């Protein structure tokens, strides 16, 4: 592999995303064609082969009433994380806690192997702030977990094997593309996954402004998790000088 850092095309693409995200239309009338296509495809398959969103939500409510242990555990984790999800936006009408709760518990019912995994709260909340309806946010979340990300990326037991594999790949890529930066982080005793696993599992929704997150997702919905590596490398390149100036892990 080359040691020249992210390609000029990667940098130009990320810069274009940043510029486009500053345009007024980026949040208020955001309707990504790629996102809607993925949602509609998932809805069509789901309606043809299983129950719609409302049925999953109703079944989740019934399962909770029956005392389903797995779903009760998922509900408890969801409630803890809801208070931590975009706290600065709560109370401003930009984030519906009830809608986020509904979508996450319906997804946990639909996919018990995943149930609820921390980080899905940020993905779900960002989808609802596009804004999407609960139904479309639900099918978008299903698309992310079931179609776009590798197996075992989000798991109920939090072993998240797929995510850990991606972190090993990302660490290798960073060492190849930005060896000085990777070496400096190693000298500081800072594992790259300390921050990058959050980037990948939250699809950057926790760390980037919503408008820019959605632009990243345009690429993600085409290339899947490969897009996350490109964005992650460019972000590290953009912050390289600042990181290299740090002399301690605390900095």
Please report, for each region that a protein language model flagged, where it lies by residue.
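Helix-rich, well-folded core regions that mediate interactions or catalysis
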Residues: 1-251
């Amino acid at each position: 592999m080359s040691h020249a850092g992210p390609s000029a095309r990667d940098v130009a693409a990320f810069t274009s995303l940043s510029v486009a995200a500053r345009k007024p239309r980026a949040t208020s009338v955001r309707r990504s064609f790629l996102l809607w296509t993925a949602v509609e495809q998932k809805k069509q398959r789901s309606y043809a082969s299983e129950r719609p969103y409302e049925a999953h939500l109703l079944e989740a409510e019934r399962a909770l009433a029956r005392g389903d242990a797995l779903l009760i555990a998922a509900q408890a984790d969801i409630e803890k994380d809801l208070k931590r999800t975009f706290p600065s936006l709560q109370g401003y009408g930009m984030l519906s806690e009830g809608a986020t709760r509904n979508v996450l518990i319906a997804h946990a019912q639909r996919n018990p192997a995943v149930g609820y995994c921390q980080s899905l709260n940020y993905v779900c909340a960002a989808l609802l702030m596009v804004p999407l309806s609960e139904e479309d946010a639900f099918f978008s979340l299903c698309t992310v977990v079931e179609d776009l990300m590798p197996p075992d990326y989000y798991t109920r037991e939090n072993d998240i094997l797929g995510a850990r594999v991606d972190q090993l790949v990302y660490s290798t890529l960073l060492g190849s593309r930005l060896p000085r930066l990777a070496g400096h982080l190693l000298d500081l005793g800072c594992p790259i996954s300390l921050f990058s696993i959050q980037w990948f599992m939250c699809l950057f929704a926790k760390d980037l402004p919503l408008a820019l997150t959605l632009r990243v997702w345009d690429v993600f919905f085409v290339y899947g998790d490969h897009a996350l590596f490109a964005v992650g490398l460019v972000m590290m390149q953009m912050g390289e000088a600042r990181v290299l100036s740090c002399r301690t892990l605390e900095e």
